[in-house]
């Protein structure tokens, strides 16, 4: 079986072989190539010790030298080169206390997480597949190398990685591997929020975000996202819905692009429904206030999972306004754009459509027609270059200073008042008119 290796990878392998060492491309890059996917990274495993690797290449970085890893830099691209090793006992469900270097490739492959990731390749030896990884690729199965409880005991994040790979590849998790996840799910508490976040985002932005069902079923979400468990367990007894909050959420995620902000928004858009639910005398559920409450809950969750501030800001804004329904008039839509931000409107329309398509058929066409009208009005406003941001005003502070106004609170109030008027009456947005209005406002304040 022939794999086309990138030139830099061939170069590194060849250089190590020239010095009498074994070297192979290994892990995910081999898996992805066999699946016809483009690897994000190419990792290399070798019998050469780290100091030897460092001596053979002019530009290297000690990325994990204690565990045998040196990054070789070629043309500003990094390639991790790791010495064959046997891992000692793991101390924190993440790192081995000790590693022992070995000259045996198969011993190195034994320590890896899943069979599909335990294959190696070079042009001389071809594919080295000691654990039938190719068979699991053909069967579309995620299966641990060796005893699943041992692999997950070594690194608890592997449990979430199993589900993430299932989501990315469209595979299923083999039964013994699945059972081990269920047995050891609580160990995920030992893993940092940053590592969990990385795996969660990869899962959510995959082709199969519905694997969040597996995250819930195996007990993983109760460790890092217990709010999702409550969503899965909260029914929606209303003609507008046909799924529980959690199932609706999963369907909504499937209705948006594989985009980080959109998938996170759909994951959290109804997060407050379990805490806002009320039931009327007819037995129907209502979720009044859930968008605003959800935005606050989303902020807490995203901070807990160590997301960056910009992601938190955008997701929380979209959660807050996902169910906002202004009357579709140019004035109302201009004010909505001003409130939400022109840069967020495209995402908001995607969120609204996904939310609607994940509901029952009750009034679906009416709801979609409303979104279409909202978006059409928004586009007309942009096409006509109407003022929807303060920076779009035909005047600014410098113009007011030139007219004799002093800087400070009063100027800010005048600019805000002019902006409010222009949102209602866009034809006012010209310099001459606004300067005259500013003068009137200033005189009124002085009276």
Features from the language model and the residues they span:
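Catalytic cores of the polymerase beta-like nucleotidyltransferase superfamily
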Residues: 1-447
